[in-house]
Amino acid sequence: MKNFKEVIIIFDSGIGGLSYFKYIKSRIGGCQYVYVADNKNFPYGEKSPEYLLEAVLFLIEKLKKIYNIGALVLACNTISVSVYNKLNFVFPVVYTLPDVSSVSDLVLKRVLLIATNTTLESKFVKDQVNIHNDLIVKAAGELVNFVEYGENYKKYALRCLEALKFEVVNTGREIVFLGCTHYLHLKVMIEDFLKIPVYENRELVVKNLIRSMNFSEHKGNYYKNDFDFVDDEFYLTENKNLTFYQNFCKKYNLRFKGMIV
């Protein structure tokens, strides 16, 4: 039976988007959120744009049979640049984009954008390099694996950070733009290692969501008076590493729903 209340779907390949979920929920209360970790296709950074478009369309069709979708937040830079302006749904789609040139505070900064290979190879990022005054891009896929898989990948993450530090020192970078939602879990580690601040775009994403759904930050509180409280929910797309994901569900107060079938 379909849930009659509109939900906001937050979508990523794994746990990267959870920090976005937490931030959005803190700003827009009262709505029900459904988080989908497409772990079957992790990491997105190694998939083609065509594959990622098919993956999104397939999963949204499944979710539409269960929920009345009010909005879709693609809490992943890779899938956002891959399917940007290619989705045609009746509900709004909010993208997480490495839109360096739109941030006024970064216009005159020497910026290092770190992201996955697929993100960096996109037209969106290539346009950013051409538009921005001083933007260098570097792949940092090893950091994604470290966030998702843990200590077994730490040595690769440290090697990656060493290479990024070399780039920062030798090109005089002033700030790092996090072009992958997984990196936000490592914000303190990245800042400590590179000795420069990072920029992350959760605020831009939540403002776009508020605008696209045509409501204020506090409209969600209205729903609390009209509907019984409903748990926010969490889905996977493959039956693996269940304990890992269930622990994150507890941390973020999400009800684990298992696999989307």
From Swiss-Prot:
Task: State the Gene Ontology terms under molecular function.
Answer: glutamate racemase activity
Record: active site: C76, C180
- InterPro entries attached here? Asp/Glu_race, Glu_race
Its UniProt entry gives the catalysed reaction(s) as: L-glutamate = D-glutamate
Q: In which pathway does it act?
A: Cell wall biogenesis; peptidoglycan biosynthesis
Broad EC category:
isomerase
**What superkingdom heads the lineage?**
Bacteria
> Which controlled-vocabulary keywords does the entry list?
Cell shape, Cell wall biogenesis/degradation, Isomerase, Peptidoglycan synthesis
Q: Does Oxidoreductase appear among the keywords?
A: no
Task: Summarize the protein's role.
Answer: Provides the (R)-glutamate required for cell wall biosynthesis.
What is the recorded name of this protein? Answer: Glutamate racemase
